[in-house]
Amino acid sequence: MKKTVLVLITFALVIAVAGSGFWLVHYFIDSREQRQTYETLAEEFVLESTPSVRPESSSSLDSSVDAGENDVSSPVESPDTPPRHDLAALAAENPDCVGWLTIPDTGIDYPVMHTPDDPEHYLRRDFYGNSASGGTPFLDGRNLAEAENQNLILYGHNMMDGSMFKPLMNYLEPNFRDTHKDIFLEIDGRQYRYALLDVLETNTQCSLYQYTDLNDPVTESNFRAAILKETDLEGVHQAPGYLTLSTCNNGGGSSRVLVIAALAGEVSQ
């Protein structure tokens, strides 16, 4: 009897291991195909023009955000300004594409999707709508696809192969935060630079998820108060807009990591 039970347990373990191996192989093949898809998109839809004037230092831009003096209508530049993408051509390829997100030297370089009537449509779909475990970064359905007066919440998966929003985990390390403060978002036909405010480990009940439309001054003030409550920041000055990047923490479940940034201004052409 004991021998029979042992054989059954061994058989079950073999099946489980084989199944896990098959899943892992499928996962990484799928991930590789997705990576190739987004690399191709980045190459095909990149624009040739780049800022020609010597960029202003990142520290001076950060100080303008901290002082609440930066005007989004006044273009700014950054030392590592990434190339722009042809958003009109991307939208012609897929009307759900409203922007492009880039964080230099992190691997985050993806189109941004927006489907207000079905907010999580791209949770497990690639740019072309095909089934994909990594999905495509997407904008919260409550947001407007514009930079000003919005807390733009972008969602992306924490993938085992290091793709999508996995690099956001690195922001939990102080040294990484200090050297990756610039976040670039192309949206509404323009390219914007956001300056990093803070990163936090939280969950899906975090109060920052409640804020998307900041057009009302009271709501905007309440949002900044919520940032102070959720982080260790001592103060957050008013900015024209904000960006919140959200991904699952390594612990899974309802745990999340949020990277919060303030709009520094439009990048000049």
PLM segments and residue spans:
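N-terminal Sec-pathway targeting helices
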Residues: 1-14
